[in-house]
């Protein structure tokens, strides 16, 4: 058939030279600019594109997660320090009034460790005094005979002085309520102790069993420290208070 068209003069005259070359097979088809494309590589590149985008997105996500963890850690650390400061403030409030000033944490812990044994000793003394009170006869005082029976059994005040530290002393006084009101009121008891070189800090009064009144007086040495003389000094305070109750 190809030969038929080529041999026909009319058909041959109507074709251009390029067309003649194509139909005659003498020439080659013009090369296409797309014939050299590797479609497999293009498909692979397109399939990898989402993976790359996901990797980039994952990178940004990882960075955001790290920043969130850092903020959470900082917030947790702030809360932890706030709780610790509140605990140390509560611990500092348990110290005597003279130590309620702003103290460093090591100083607070040191004073508390020293103060706890002193409180334990004070509790032991109070328990001992309580036992003495429970075994003491508490007969009622009759009018007109208060002075003669004041130092008799059950009538004499029970006094206990305890050193809190080198400067402070706690004095507890237990006596019959009618004696407290007429012979040794709290104001007179404080005055007696101040005459011994002590500075009044605080006090409390309570009523207990056996129609007795209890004084708890917190004092501080005005000058110097108590140190080793504490037992003798406390004994002297106890004697002074008892003697004052005789008046």
UniProtKB/Swiss-Prot annotation:
Expressed constitutively at low levels in the roots. Also observed in flowers, developing seeds, embryos and vascular bundles. It holds the Pfam family HLH. Disruption phenotype: Reduced growth compared after germination. Lower mugineic acid family phytosiderophores (MAs) secretion and hypersensitivity to iron (Fe) deficiency. Reduced induction of genes involved in iron homeostasis upon iron deficiency and ethylene treatment. GO terms for cellular component: cytoplasm; RNA polymerase II transcription regulator complex. It is found in: Nucleus; Cytoplasm. Residues 82-119 are annotated as: Helix-loop-helix motif. The keyword Flavoprotein does not apply. Induction: Strongly induced in both roots and shoots during iron (Fe) deficiency stress. Ethylene enhances the iron deficiency-mediated induction. Induced by arsenate (AsV25 and AsV50); this induction is repressed by nitric oxide (NO). Accumulates under cadmium (Cd) stress; this induction is inhibited by the DNA methyltransferase inhibitor 5-aza-2-deoxycytidine (Aza). Residues 68-119 form the bHLH domain. Keywords: Activator, Cytoplasm, DNA-binding, Ethylene signaling pathway, Iron, Nucleus, Stress response, Transcription, Transcription regulation. GO terms for biological process: ethylene-activated signaling pathway; positive regulation of DNA-templated transcription; positive regulation of siderophore biosynthetic process; regulation of DNA-templated transcription; regulation of ethylene-activated signaling pathway; regulation of transcription by RNA polymerase II; response to arsenic-containing substance; response to cadmium ion. Its main location: nucleus. Residues 68-81 are annotated as: Basic motif. The keyword Cytoplasm applies. GO terms for molecular function: DNA-binding transcription factor activity; DNA-binding transcription factor activity, RNA polymerase II-specific; protein dimerization activity; RNA polymerase II transcription regulatory region sequence-specific DNA binding. A motif (Nuclear localization signal) lies at residues 68-75. Belongs to the bHLH protein family. Transcription activator that binds to the DNA motif 5'-CACGTGG-3' in the promoter of iron (Fe) deficiency-inducible genes as well as of genes involved in iron homeostasis, thus contributing to basal tolerance to iron deficiency, iron uptake from soil and iron transport, particularly during seed maturation and germination. Promotes the accumulation of mugineic acid family phytosiderophores (MAs). Required for ethylene-mediated signaling during iron deficiency responses. Improves growth and yield, especially in calcareous soil with low iron availability. Forms homodimers. Interacts with BHLH156 in the nucleus. This is Protein IRON-RELATED TRANSCRIPTION FACTOR 2. It comes from Oryza sativa subsp. japonica (Rice).
């Amino acid at each position: 058939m190809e030969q038929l068209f080529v041999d026909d003069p009319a058909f041959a005259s109507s074709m251009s030279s390029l067309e003649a070359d194509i139909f005659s097979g003498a020439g080659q088809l013009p090369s296409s600019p797309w014939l050299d494309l590797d479609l497999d590589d293009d498909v692979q590149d397109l399939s990898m594109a989402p993976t790359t985008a996901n990797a980039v997105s994952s990178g940004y996500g990882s960075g955001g997660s790290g920043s969130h963890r850092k903020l959470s850690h900082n917030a947790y650390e702030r809360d932890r320090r706030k709780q610790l400061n509140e605990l140390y403030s509560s611990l500092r409030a348990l110290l005597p009034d003279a130590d309620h000033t702003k103290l460093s944490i090591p100083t607070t812990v040191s004073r508390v460790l020293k103060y706890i044994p002193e409180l334990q000793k004070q509790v032991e003394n109070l328990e001992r005094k309580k036992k003495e009170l429970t075994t003491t006869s508490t007969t009622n005082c009759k009018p007109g005979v208060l002075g003669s029976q004041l130092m008799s059994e059950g009538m004499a005040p029970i006094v206990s002085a305890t050193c809190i530290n080198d400067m402070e002393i706690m004095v507890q006084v237990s006596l019959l309520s009618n004696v407290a009101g007429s012979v040794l009121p709290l104001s007179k008891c404080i005055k007696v102790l101040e005459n011994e070189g002590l500075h009044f800090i605080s006090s409390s009064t309570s009523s207990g069993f056996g129609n007795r009144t209890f004084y708890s007086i917190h004092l501080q040495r005005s000058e110097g420290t108590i140190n080793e003389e504490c037992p003798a000094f406390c004994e002297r305070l106890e004697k002074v208070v008892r003697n004052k109750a005789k008046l």
